[in-house]
């Protein structure tokens, strides 16, 4: 679904979410615009011509975005921390702030991105009256041969005067979701990863399957969950078309509202 960004740039009041692709979401709420794990590159890899390439182009061009107040990054894997995209975002708007888990600020700063704030689990910061909370998740980090788990990974809660949004990042299912729901919920909307779960024996600890994604949204006390982290890059063994079907089927057995957006689609919440 092509989205030229016109309505997004004009929007100052309606809370919306737009799926750019993979774990990249544009959220507009309570007077702020922010991105999650932005990647516009064709290949998430240290070597651009080696690795999984996009199956679908980004839903909105970078240049067509509204002014971005801040970016949240879940961890340093190449499909979530994409330096070419981050550099371009920093150039497009010198006021954009970049929030990263502990151990990741140096990487951005060495690449010319100065407005970086490193956060630990439990840290919070106020942006224009909206709170950004760095929270636990169950994953790992690695960007080169000798840096496995040397930087932190996280999920994020964005809580404003009117709306509350949860971004699960990349994660396996864990009991911490219930704690997040108790402390920061309920959420109007939770973005949960539903892809990259096969083979299950290898992926289970760090990647939820669609049924677990539904349970995670229930645990954080979300009214509605939106599926993400699927259908953009072929990262694992399940068919690209399978995750949203299983996600919808699992959600329909519960009280949870479930959204499967087309890439580029905007929906209000």
Annotate each PLM feature:
Residues 1-12, 20, 29-76, 83-91, ...:
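Pre-active-site segment of Zn-dependent metallo-hydrolases
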Residues 25-28, 126-188, 204, 208-211:
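Catalytic core of the metallo-beta-lactamase
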Residues 1-12, 101-163, 246-266:
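Metallo-beta-lactamase
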Residues 70, 77, 97-99, 103-106, ...:
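Cap/insert and terminal regions of metallo-dependent hydrolase folds
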Residues 62-68, 76-82, 107-122, 168:
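Conserved N-terminal glycine/acidic-rich loop preference
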Residues 14-16, 93-97, 164-165:
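Short active-site oxyanion
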Residues 36-37, 97, 114-123, 189-192:
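Short hydrophobic/aromatic-enriched beta-strand-loop microsegments
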Residues 31, 38-40, 102-104, 136, ...:
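A mature extracytoplasmic/lumenal domain signature
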């Amino acid at each position: 679904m092509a989205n030229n960004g016109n309505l997004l740039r004009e929007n100052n009041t309606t809370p919306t979410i737009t799926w750019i692709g993979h774990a990249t979401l544009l959220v507009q709420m309570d007077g702020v615009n922010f991105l999650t794990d932005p990647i516009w590159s064709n290949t998430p890899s240290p070597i651009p011509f080696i690795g999984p390439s996009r199956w679908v182009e980004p839903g909105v061009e970078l240049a067509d975005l509204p002014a971005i107040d801040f970016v949240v990054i879940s961890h340093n894997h190449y499909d979530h921390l994409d330096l070419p995209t981050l550099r371009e975002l920093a150039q497009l708007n010198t006021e954009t702030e970049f929030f990263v888990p502990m151990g990741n600020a140096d990487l951005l700063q060495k690449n010319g991105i100065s407005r970086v704030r490193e956060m630990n689990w439990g840290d919070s910061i106020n942006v224009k009256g909206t709170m950004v909370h760095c929270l636990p998740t169950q994953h790992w980090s690695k960007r080169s041969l000798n840096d496995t788990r040397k930087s932190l990974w996280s999920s994020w809660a964005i809580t404003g005067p009117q709306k509350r949004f949860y971004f699960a990042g990349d994660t396996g299912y864990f009991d911490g979701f219930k704690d997040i729901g108790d402390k920061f919920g309920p959420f109007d909307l939770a973005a949960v990863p539903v892809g990259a779960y096969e083979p299950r024996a290898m992926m289970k600890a760090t990647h939820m399957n669609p049924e677990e994604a539904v349970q995670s949204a229930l645990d954080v006390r979300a009214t509605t969950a939106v599926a993400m982290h699927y259908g953009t890059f072929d990262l694992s063994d399940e068919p690209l078309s399978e995750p949203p079907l299983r996600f919808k089927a699992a959600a329909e057995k519960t009280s949870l509202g479930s959204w499967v957006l087309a890439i580029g689609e905007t929906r209000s919440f």
